[in-house]
Amino acid sequence: MRWVTWASSLLAFLLYYNTMDAGFVYDDRRAILTNPDVTGHTPAEALFQNDFWGTPLADDGSHGSYRPLCVATYRLNYALSGLRPWSYHFLNVLLHCTATALVAITAKKLLPRACSRVGTAVTALTFAAHPIHTEAVAAIVGRADLAACNLFLLSFLVYNEHLRLRDISGKMKGNCLYRSDDFVRARSLSTGDQNFRLSCHGLVQQIFSNFRKLLKAGKMGPLRLISGDGLGYAVKTEGSSKGSESSVSVSEDSELLKWLSLSGALGLAGAATLCKEPAITVVPLCIVYDLLRGYRQNTVHHKNRWRSICLLSTGGVTMLYWRLRLAGAPPTFATADNPAARDPALLTRALTFAYLPIFNFYLLLFPFHLSFDWSMDAIPRITSLFDPRNIVTATFYTIVSKVAWRAIKHEFLRELSESKEIKVYKPRGSCKTKYKSNISRHPHRNLESADRRAYHAPHRDGGGKKLCPCTGCRHPVSEDHSGICRTMNNNNYMNHQSCICAVAVKAKQIKPQTVYNSSRVALLTFLAFMALPFVPASNFLFYVGFVVAERVLYLPSVGFCLLLGLGAGTMTKGWHRNELKSRMFLGSLLLCLLAMCGQTIKRNMDWRDEESLFKSALHINPPKAYGNLGSVLSAQGRTAEAEAAFRRALAHRPNMADVHYNLGILLQNQRRYEAAIKSFERAIYFRPSMALAYVNLGAALASDGRLSEAVSVLRAGTRVDGTRVRDRREHDSARVSALVQLAALHVQRSHWHKALAAYREALQIIPESEVPIVGWTRHSVLTMAGEIYAQLRHWAQAERSARQALAAAPRDAATHLAYAKLLARNASRSLEAEEWFKKALNLDPNNPEVRDQFGQFLRSQQRLSEAAEQLVAAAQLAPSNAARAAAAARALRDAQRCRSAERWYERAAVLSPEDAQSHSNLGAILHLNGKYAAAAAAYRRALQLLPGDEITLTNLKRVYTLMTNQHRT
């Protein structure tokens, strides 16, 4: 069945190949683009101190999602490819392919043998192509679900390997597995109770056994020991003495591998939890699977099974306790995120939360009604018992309960009733039939007959003894050593734990008692696979910040696909009896698969960019979709469409503060200040903690000339309480912006000391690190404060502030440039200033601002030729900047390079055709170069733009005079 694994993984890759050229959409921006843990602005240990979005877990506004391993993969992507999205999408697709392969392996191990072939194929192909996975794969933030699913399945498979090794170990120590006298000899030599009671012959045999064990381990290697092939021969009943002794060595090795695999399962479960919290449910899933798998086993295995379950439970409880303690106080979410959670009516909450799992199951069953967001009222709350959806809820839970109960009834209760009919062991004296096992009287009896009467250790009950019958032949055996036992062990005392019975061996070979023979047990396992990972998102244990999230269904969909595989395999079990029906059924499965593939490809196109994504959800969640679509259209410059989208969103839901704020930004950019002010005021009314609205409201008031009101609003914005805000970095950035704008207003009104106070307050908000607060850094604010000190002529404080900025950002060219400009104000430190200008130029040689400022400094030093070179370079680096072109032309004219200056004046006039000064300057340089006709035309154009300009009129008269004199001569 390896072809199924490879084919399904290949299908998964082909279906999601078209996501490689997608960009960062929706939640990707906050999780990656503005997350300092991803961009490397924080140390590596901060990954284990912050939540998924980069907010410290100790912060009141933390989301509470702790996924450091997932964030570490983002950081690795950033280190390898920066912010190019293709590498992020490629890793997502790769993780989906590996998850598909693991699902195929899991299906092969869990499905009943009779339906394994078709069931595995249906399970793996359905998982690869299911459209519900598009959000998890196409959205980069879905990597948490992808990585968690991979580690979840690996943990389960490793625990399954632990069960296999445990069974092998139990069978080797248990009853009725081997019949050869060679095994009895090897088994006796491996018993720890004989270490000091062996004869000389036994001691030699033990030495040889240990030596053979080392040879076998070296010959087989660790991989074959772990694989089924390496341990499989240990349970064979036929073989030579060499095989028997090897089985003993492998048994002892399997003990170590057994506990290593259990530790590995717990370790993988912990790693999965560090990718996404619902993956911790792999621990109860393994426990449920172990109980379902072991109910048919003999009592010999119970002790080992409960030991594994206890250890697994201890590890799971420890992880859960650590995670809950790490989370601290539960996060708070907005009412719009999960309206039912904030509903005051208990009945509404109960009915709605009972219905939501059915809606999620509907999305798995019919994944053609998908949305990027299901918040707000995308799914109306159930407020009455008479809502028709309650019938669906009751029907669904009734069917699931009945199916589960029938499976339990037919498997477990029947097994219990059969176990009661087993004959209880009786004291030896009460046995009606006497069985003799004196093999010494029949020395020529064949070995198999002797094995049927082998010794089994009696159970003690008080003072009496009960004989333990052979589990294979059900016959009581002798209390004393059998003839074979005495022969093999030189009449030494043996603490036997097993009898040797060929009947039992044959029974074990013919009727293996495993879970794979029961479709009902498989059904219960798959239901657990689907239900347990969904429990953390069900609102039953605690409220979550969403109504429905499609990427959360990535892990539960494994159980759903396994159920589909079980159903398909069961229906095609007798396919050879009716070939027509089987072909029709397989054809319908193929059509369903093709439909899912088509929907997946189509849905991937929706996730290509934000505009297509938001448009795809207009019919499902109109207020959210229109609001986000308006932001995208506004960023693209499509202002009319953006405004229409914002107003449609507000028509559906008028209390959305984000939409009011974004509409205000749009109106502010159009200089419609009155309308913008109203939008910002509504945003503040619906969300008083929205600091960004205060910032932009203050800016709009200042632009409208209402400076006093602007100062009051900005001061209020700096004092907004940020407790439990969704994005603490954005909130702090808004407060810093308010303080910076407040300082600018104070500077405009010449209130220098108030401006300094605002900058000092901003520095208290910004942390003393290189972590940007969404656009604001500590060194940028220190630089602005230094400029204020320079205006006040407090040179010592100005230099101290500049030095602090350099210490905070030693590789920032703008900080070096600011310090150089500060030094240039002091004529005695011009050489030192020139050194700092050169340092800034070395740090950022392609920055036109650095070259422009350096050129201005050189010009002030009367080094005109060098100044012209720097200013021309600045103009070349900013080819669309008319001011830089004009500055380069002036520097060239001062350096007596008038022909070169002419070209740059022409460039400036082309870049700013409506600027009269540009045309006047062009006329002047043409005048100097002797091109009088062209100079007159430039002067006339300048006078058209600025009639009555005296300088231009004077220059034009001079040109006319020169042209007249030239004509006369």
State where each predicted segment sits.
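Short coil loop/turn residues that delineate tetratricopeptide repeat
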Residues: S616-P623, N655, S689, T723-R724, ...
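Low-complexity, disordered terminal segments
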Residues: N490-N492
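Conserved alpha-helical positions within TPR/SEL1-like repeat arrays
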Residues: K624-A635, D658-N669, L692-S703, R728-V747, ...
